[in-house]
């Protein structure tokens, strides 16, 4: 991992620290109608259980603002104290003023400089939110999106650019406008009295190369904690790959303190998918460990049986299910490496390199499956119960290696 290009401030959001030398934080956002307390609480609990360390909720009208304190109370009944971020557009100043209990209950406010107010009202309405944040000792994310960019600012920069001897391209102007909007807003917030360690900024776009270019420049120009993410990543494989590529490159360069993957969920798909992708990005970069990793081969002509795929799925599902209790009982188990391989070519080698691994027989190979523990052959499995026996061996390994001595 690359070193941080600039040392960022540390921002406390509820019980979570963002920035500085702290681990990159995983965020998510609900898609429920916030005023529906029951559904919103249910989704927040699911997101938090999946590993989201901060959850953002839409606060777009009076019903939503009035529901926020009740949502926090209901979460507490489930022993869930995940910080909630209020997502405000257009009317945040009004809602936070009219519903002071909402302002108190939220752990952070998100403001979009592009729609916090227009014309002469912009600075006034922005200032109202900042003053409420100061009064309640709350941090603020100044989140700029290129889909809702401040048009007055953009027009100003275009006019200035047109007067230059060597004008920038329209794309470069867009990048400059995003960064300028964020930094000018952050500077104004500080002038109003909001401390630097209460400010997080983001400049979100939808294209990978644009995101990389904007954040590389942004990281050089400021010391604020940075929130990373494509503003709309898309659905399925496209959204996952675009997010992994863009966030992976920036994080590897040491840019970014908290991330969200804005996937479009497939119909009836769980909202928690975006959390899983965030965690996989961080774990595969070696920045954090959340759950034991499973190395498995893709299969080839040597592995005509589907059994190794079935076993891989069973092992992964078992590990994911058990981690909710294991992480409390067995310190360090999240770093465990498991291998499930399908033939003799790479099977023994990968299994030896894992903490615990199994090499299943490929086509035409002897119908036995050696199990390796800490690099040494420990068992040989055969017959119809290989799956159950291997999972039992994994269970015993966890207890023996990670249990309290």
From Swiss-Prot:
Catalytic activity: (2E)-4-hydroxy-3-methylbut-2-enyl diphosphate + oxidized [flavodoxin] + H2O + 2 H(+) = 2-C-methyl-D-erythritol 2,4-cyclic diphosphate + reduced [flavodoxin]
One MF term in the entry's GO annotations: 4-hydroxy-3-methylbut-2-enyl-diphosphate synthase activity (flavodoxin)
Protein name per the record: 4-hydroxy-3-methylbut-2-en-1-yl diphosphate synthase (flavodoxin)
GO BP field: isopentenyl diphosphate biosynthetic process, methylerythritol 4-phosphate pathway; terpenoid biosynthetic process
Residue sites binding [4Fe-4S] cluster per the record: 297, 300, 343, 350
Biological function: Converts 2C-methyl-D-erythritol 2,4-cyclodiphosphate (ME-2,4cPP) into 1-hydroxy-2-methyl-2-(E)-butenyl 4-diphosphate.
Coiled coil regions in record: none
Cofactor(s) required, per the database record: [4Fe-4S] cluster
Keyword list, A-Z: 4Fe-4S, Iron, Iron-sulfur, Isoprene biosynthesis, Metal-binding, Oxidoreductase
Pfam short name (any one): GcpE
PANTHER family membership: 4-HYDROXY-3-METHYLBUT-2-EN-1-YL DIPHOSPHATE SYNTHASE (PTHR30454), 4-HYDROXY-3-METHYLBUT-2-EN-1-YL DIPHOSPHATE SYNTHASE (FERREDOXIN), CHLOROPLASTIC (PTHR30454:SF0)
Protein's UniProt keywords contain Repeat: no
SUPFAM superfamilies: Dihydropteroate synthetase-like (SSF51717), Nitrite and sulphite reductase 4Fe-4S domain-like (SSF56014)
Keyword Transit peptide assigned: no
Family: Belongs to the IspG family.
Pathway: Isoprenoid biosynthesis; isopentenyl diphosphate biosynthesis via DXP pathway; isopentenyl diphosphate from 1-deoxy-D-xylulose 5-phosphate: step 5/6
Annotated organism of origin: Francisella tularensis subsp. tularensis (strain SCHU S4 / Schu 4)
């Amino acid at each position: 991992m690359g070193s941080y290009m600039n040392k960022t401030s540390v921002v406390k959001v509820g019980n979570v620290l963002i920035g500085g030398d702290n681990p990159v934080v995983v965020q998510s956002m609900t898609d429920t109608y916030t005023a529906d307390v029951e559904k919103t609480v249910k989704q927040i609990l699911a997101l938090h259980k999946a590993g989201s360390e901060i959850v953002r909720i839409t606060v777009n009208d009076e019903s939503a603002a009035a529901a926020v304190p009740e949502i926090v109370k209901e979460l507490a009944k489930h022993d869930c104290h995940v910080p909630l971020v209020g997502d405000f557009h257009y009317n945040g100043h009004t809602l936070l003023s009219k519903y002071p209990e909402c302002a108190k209950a939220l752990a952070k406010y998100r403001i979009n400089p592009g729609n916090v107010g227009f014309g002469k009202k912009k600075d006034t309405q922005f200032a109202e939110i900042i003053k409420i944040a100061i009064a309640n000792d709350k941090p603020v994310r100044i989140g700029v999106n290129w889909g809702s960019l401040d048009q007055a600012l953009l027009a100003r920069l275009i006019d200035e650019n047109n007067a230059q001897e060597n004008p920038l391209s329209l794309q470069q102007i867009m990048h400059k406008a995003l960064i300028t909007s964020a930094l000018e807003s952050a500077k104004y917030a500080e002038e109003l009295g909001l401390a630097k360690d209460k400010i997080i900024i983001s400049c979100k776009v939808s294209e990978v190369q644009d995101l990389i270019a904007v954040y590389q420049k942004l990281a050089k120009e400021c010391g604020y904690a940075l929130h990373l993410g494509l503003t709309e990543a898309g659905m399925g494989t496209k959204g996952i790959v675009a997010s992994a590529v863009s966030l992976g490159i920036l994080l590897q360069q040491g840019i970014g303190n908290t991330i969200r993957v804005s996937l479009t969920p497939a119909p009836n798909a769980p909202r928690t998918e975006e959390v899983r992708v965030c965690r996989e990005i961080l774990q595969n970069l070696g920045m954090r460990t959340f759950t034991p990793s499973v190395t498995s081969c893709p299969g080839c002509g040597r592995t005509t049986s589907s059994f190794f795929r079935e076993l891989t799925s069973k092992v992964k599902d078992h590990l994911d299910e058990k981690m909710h209790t294991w992480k409390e009982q067995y310190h360090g188990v999240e770093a465990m490496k498991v291998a499930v391989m399908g033939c003799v070519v790479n099977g023994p080698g990968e299994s030896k390199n894992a903490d615990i691994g199994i090499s299943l027989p490929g086509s035409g190979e002897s119908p036995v499956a050696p199990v390796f523990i800490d690099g040494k052959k420990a068992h040989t499995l055969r017959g119809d119960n290989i799956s159950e026996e291997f999972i039992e061996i994994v269970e015993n390994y966890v207890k023996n290696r990670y249990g309290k001595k």
